[in-house]
Amino acid sequence: MTKMEMGQSQHHEFWTIGLNVHGHDCRLPKSSLCWKTFYPLVDTQLVRRQPRPRLPKFTTIGQWYWGGSVEVNGTFPDLSKKIAFEPYLDLPKRIPEARFELAMNIKAEDSEKARLRERGWHIVDPHRVARTPSAYRRYMAGALAEFTAIKGVDVAWRTGWLSDRAAAFLALGRPVITEDTGAEKYIPWGSGFRFVRDAREAETAVKEVLWDWARLSKEARNGAVEIFDSAENLRRILAL
């Protein structure tokens, strides 16, 4: 994005969900573009808080493998979820009372699926559980919370990136346990997030969700409405 790629020369403004793009600790390459930041959006009128699910499930939806390539300091690092999740794979054994699930693109014959199952992870097909927008929301509502790891470049470069998927989980009343990309300082405490840096912190966050879900669920919903609501954010972006 420092080389005017993807037709940027035709744009008048440049917006990013990298909340920390102007932070002193952000390690993104310096750019001549004047980036403005905004929060990921969720329609909080469409995506409503849902009752507590039956199973103590922690899940996320994404691509386990990533076939793209991004040059970082002259190298092309592996930006897959496979690499990102590696430090957390023992969580099912450390917290047997929780169900850890991944809706990821891992084929039945892939040895990676067997490896994850041996570590206690449940694997489901994202093209089945999230095949439509309504199915996507139902699947997320079936979890107590989102647990996810972030591609390494966002963590290492302190971009402040957050996903719109996280905003949707919050709107459903589902707390979000995720790695900190530098976004934590832009999110008020008590907004449904638990930012973690290693497996020990993740274990603490999961256990907190298990024993104090009702409070955290309410915080998550309030955080979605107050921070990520699409109508409010679009008004700010358009200066209405």
Model-identified regions with their sequence ranges:
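A structural signal for short, well-ordered beta-strand segments and their strand-loop junctions
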Residues: E13-I17, T59-I61, R99-N105, F147-T148, ...
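Active-site-proximal region of nucleotide-activated glycan assembly enzymes
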Residues: M1-F38
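Short secondary-structure boundary/capping segments
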Residues: E5-M6, R49-Q50, K185
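Catalytic binding pocket for nucleotide-activated donors in carbohydrate/polymer assembly enzymes
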Residues: L79-K82, E86, E112-L240
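Short, polar loop motifs at secondary-structure junctions
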Residues: G18-H22, N105-S111, E179-A183
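Short, well-ordered coil/turn elements that cap or connect secondary structure elements
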Residues: Q8-S9, K30, I95-E97, E118, ...
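Conserved catalytic-core segment of nucleotide-activated headgroup transferases in glycan assembly
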Residues: R27-G142, V153
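N-terminal cationic-hydrophobic initiation segments that often serve targeting/anchoring roles
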Residues: M6, P92-K93, L210
